[in-house]
Amino acid sequence: MNNPRHNIRDVRAPQGTELNAKSWMTEAPLRMLMNNLDPDVAERPHELVVYGGIGRAARTWDDFDRIVATLKDLNEDETLIVQSGKPVGVFRTHKDAPRVLIANSNLVPHWANWDHFNELDKKGLAMYGQMTAGSWIYIGTQGIVQGTYETFVEAGRQHYDGNLKGKWILTGGLGGMGGAQPLAAVMAGACCLAVECDETRVDFRLRTRYVDAKAHTLDEALALIDQWTKAGEAKSVGLIGNAAEIFPELFRRGVRPDIVTDQTSAHDPIHGYLPAGWTVAEWRAKQESDPKAVAAAARASMKVHVQAMVDFWNAGVPTLDYGNNIRQVAKDEGLENAFAFPGFVPAYIRPLFCRGIGPFRWAALSGDPEDIYKTDAKVKELLPDNKHLHNWLDMARERIAFQGLPARICWVGLGDRHRLGLAFNEMVRNGELKAPVVIGRDHLDSGSVASPNRETEAMKDGSDAVSDWPLLNALLNTASGATWVSLHHGGGVGMGFSQHSGMVICADGTDDAARRLERVLWNDPATGVMRHADAGYDIAVECAKEQGLRLPGILGN
């Protein structure tokens, strides 16, 4: 094999109750690692790329094989250490310790940039883990659908009296994360025009029912949008094109969407963003032969792209950055007012973070969709008054196609996550579920990320860049007994702009699991409430008091 990162084999997670490892605590990370590379889940699985430009699950195929072999042989009192996608050690710990500890793409701050990372990457010394790619808890595009839905719903509340019927959203990017936008828009009641340069990605979203139609010309796409909005229908179209060309053209034509955003992979100027005027084939070739030229051309195109977004904003169109760092690139390229429009977290999501509410998710290791439907019902039973959440679960069941192992995303917060975890564990114990479930979250959560251009943008106390919080979150989840814990750098917004942590815990129906679940699923969201209370948010302070958190330096208790 000439390229250690390319292999033609297909990987799929085992299903059912037969173990391939020594216990469910090691079977769980094994299955979720393999699930990340399922052809129905990953963007470029043969290259180990899960999503987000070059977000990988393992450094090389040899490393993947070594991780799999080690997990199969790992004892219940041992912990596997994974350094940027490479299994570097196994150490004796104890039964309540994590079975896997992962660190991906972390660099000393002075060297935390794409140029230095790319040098290490070429030498085989590093791997970009994105957020859930290298931490083995990616569940396909569903993983971001509800967060995007919540954002669009809140935008509708703020700007259109809570009604997006007859409205349409303009966006770019239909990759693993951006692909959620059309479906989220439709669920929120709006139409969506999503610009994507790679036709295979549009076809992937059509196949998985995340987008309703495909267009090859702007006129064709606008005709569909006009037809649907006039009829009051909520539908979406993926337009084959370049956002850096389409956005300015729409503005020049006098077309005014009702909401404008973008989720191209602008965080990675080489692998994530097609320069204006280039073909996809030319772009792919020059990524290898002349990456600096690609980056320069992409950055120049991003400046044009963001200028169009600023123009829409100045024209009165609600416009939001969706966390890909495109404003920062445009500013670095000389666009002084690139940050004229806000990021989605300070504009719409932060009140949820203040209560520890974020992208809680779980996957059925059995592979049986019925296990997810049963847990959906359990969520409704335990949270009977949360009709907004019930509506989400109903829409998710109807509209979201499972990718790989069946899974569910469900935004809940402190006080509810541990109750759900314990209930799922009991369902495994009594046989309601056919096999254990794993419970995790995105790194995009209330207490697990420092990202000044995204999750921690415009913090009330100016603590946007303080990254103690995700480090403490990872340490606390390790001490609390999560099944695997990860600490990453650069996810979402690229090298030098974020640090973040993840956790996953397996509910196998045992008493030991119940104790760990109660600790982890309380402590993890509690760190988010703590972080926001420390920053001076009244909602977080009130939540901390209601939940009885002991925060001596914040509450004085």
Swiss-Prot record:
It catalyses: 4-imidazolone-5-propanoate = trans-urocanate + H2O. It is found in: Cytoplasm. It is an enzyme of class 4 (lyase). Binds 1 NAD(+) per subunit. Its main location: cytoplasm. InterPro entries: Urocanase, Urocanase-like, Urocanase_C, Urocanase_central_sf, Urocanase_CS, Urocanase_N, Urocanase_Rossmann-like, Urocanase_sf. SUPFAM superfamilies: Urocanase. Its EC number is 4.2.1.49. Its cofactor is NAD(+). One of its GO terms (biological process) is L-histidine catabolic process to glutamate and formate. Pathway: Amino-acid degradation; L-histidine degradation into L-glutamate; N-formimidoyl-L-glutamate from L-histidine: step 2/3. Pfam families: Urocanase, Urocanase_C, Urocanase_N. NAD(+) binds at residues 52-53, 130, 176-178, 196, 201, 242-243, 263-267, 273-274, 322, 492. It comes from the Bacteria. Catalyzes the conversion of urocanate to 4-imidazolone-5-propionate. Belongs to the urocanase family. This is Urocanate hydratase.
